[in-house]
Amino acid sequence: MTVTPHLFIPGPTNIPDAVRMAMNIPMEDMRSPEFPKFTLPLFEDLKKAFKMKDGRVFIFPSSGTGAWESAVENTLATGDKVLMSRFGQFSLLWVDMCERLGLKVEVCDEEWGTGVPVEKYADILAKDKNHEIKAVFVTHNETATGVSSDVAGVRKALDAAKHPALLMVDGVSSVGSLDMRMGEWGVDCCVSGSQKGFMLPTGLGILAVSQKALDINKSKNGRMNRCFFSFEDMIKTNDQGFFPYTPATQLLRGLRTSLDLLFAEGLDNVFARHTRLASGVRAAVDAWGLKLCAKEPKWYSDTVSAILVPEGIDSNAITKTAYYRYNTSFGLGLNKVAGKVFRIGHLGMLDEVMIGGALFAAEMALKDNGVNLKLGSGTGAAAEYFSKNATKSATALTPKQAKAA
């Protein structure tokens, strides 16, 4: 019997059956008079996932990187000064994009395993009396190192300095899994993608934009050249329920069902489930005598754990053993932590028993590659935690059942 490898990477994530079935439909006319009846409510419901107070959400047929680019090109001009930090592969790539697009980037280089340096940001913003900095960037969840950063803290720093800079957030591996309070935190652009917390295949770049950022887009002269990722083209057609070019219609149908599942479970319950699963993984890591790449508990991510392996052991060998011997996929270490960590993704459509299987495979792969641990130690610690904290699995419920649960 052939079994599809068990997937525990930090994206793409597992796709619920209901979402797959929603996408398994014939092609449809994306310019039919009926199409807006589907898309207009979808745009509005997406705003709920970001907890927005105003503004709008754009859906591009791209990965999250496309949404990154759109956020930058539509709100900033070549030569604008921006404040960023670099502490993992994806925060690094965002800095690289901004530099290549012609922005003047002030970078705070931080140790991998830490996150956005809120105190440094506060000091830099307080000293920027002429408001030369036009935007401040935050990678909410750095998947390369399993680090989450304090978006609300950055907003407080901006407010304390009475600074008007835009607050730009990479929420690719956080939205739909970790709490994102875009309105409360005063986030101006929040980037996400379909393949993480939204539990879809890759292919949708989702960008939530505040009214402040929309107003800047409308009034500012000298902005970057753009075409495919233009806000103006999107607004003109989205208002009618359409798109400026061919949309990924099946993915949009899947997104509708994904949102229904998230709302049926309740966003706060979704976030609590991710915290429980992450806590179980951390209990296992501790029992194995290993450490996370994240340096302190304040940095711990509830969507992915990057686990440091002992010196002299190649983490790539562990992921290969897990894949070929135990039919389980874990994330590789990237860039500076390549060969030093492997990553367990615990986001999306997962519950305690599924995570238990991931830990079972990880434990055996670690042991097979010479890590000194006792089989059953990590899985036992996680089971102990889950047995005390688990609730009825939301992933097993249909939206109708979840409402009644």
Swiss-Prot record:
Keyword presence, Transferase: yes
A family per Pfam: Aminotran_5
Question: Which residues are annotated as modified residue N6-(pyridoxal phosphate)lysine in the UniProt record?
Answer: K196
Which SUPFAM superfamilies does the annotation name? PLP-dependent transferases (SSF53383)
Please give the cofactor(s) recorded in the UniProt entry for this protein. Answer: pyridoxal 5'-phosphate
| Catalytic reactions on record | glyoxylate + L-serine = 3-hydroxypyruvate + glycine
Q: Which family does it belong to?
A: Belongs to the class-V pyridoxal-phosphate-dependent aminotransferase family.
Q: What is this protein called?
A: Serine--glyoxylate aminotransferase
**Per the UniProt entry, what species is this protein from, by scientific name?**
Hyphomicrobium methylovorum
Q: Which gene encodes it?
A: sgaA
